[in-house]
Amino acid sequence: FIAGTYGVGKSTLCDKLCRKLNIPAFSAGDLISEINGETYGKNKVVKNKIANQNILISAVEKKLSLYPTFLLAGHFCIFDKSDEVEILPEFIYEEMPIVKIILLETDFDRILRNIKSRDDKSYNLDSIKNIIRLEREQAEKISSQLSIPLHIHKMDFAESDIKQISTIIQGSAT
């Protein structure tokens, strides 16, 4: 499970890892969108997070019937329509066969720039700091509760990211 806040580089990293490791990669948001028809482009607003998590569980089960291993990019926390942080329901992680959690992090100013560039959306600094903090807290909590190894990776936005994460995925890093 490749986790991290908006704008941390999950999709870009997963695309590169997919090619390097020959493992399919999917975005949780894209899997949900394929079924419920909602698009989570620039606004990122989720209408029903419980229903969406149930959709995700079903979509992951379908993908597992096709692929024994794949990368799933997603979140532990999201913003609501008021840009307040919402923690996603914990049952979702219990229902998915997650082998490792790789939490991507970077500086809040980089996240703000990435989101502005990609989505033309501006979040206030406190909201970004809060979601970064809560994303890590939830990753640590889920890792501990479910005994799933957690790897926290500080993004450099360079080839070194691909090399380090590939090593973690392939199991030669602790």
Please annotate each region the language model reported.
Residues I2:
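Hydrophobic anchor at the beta1->P-loop junction of P-loop NTPases
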Residues T5:
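P-loop (Walker A) phosphate-binding loop of NTP-binding proteins
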Residues L66-H75:
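Loop/turn-to-beta-strand initiation segments
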Residues H75-R118:
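ATP-dependent NMP and nucleoside kinases share a basic, alpha-helical "lid"
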Residues K121-I162:
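Small-molecule kinase domains that catalyze NTP-dependent phosphoryl transfer to phosphate-bearing small molecules
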Residues G9:
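Conserved glycine(s) of the Walker
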Residues T12:
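Conserved Walker
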Residues D15-L56:
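Conserved substrate/cofactor phosphate-moiety recognition/catalytic segment
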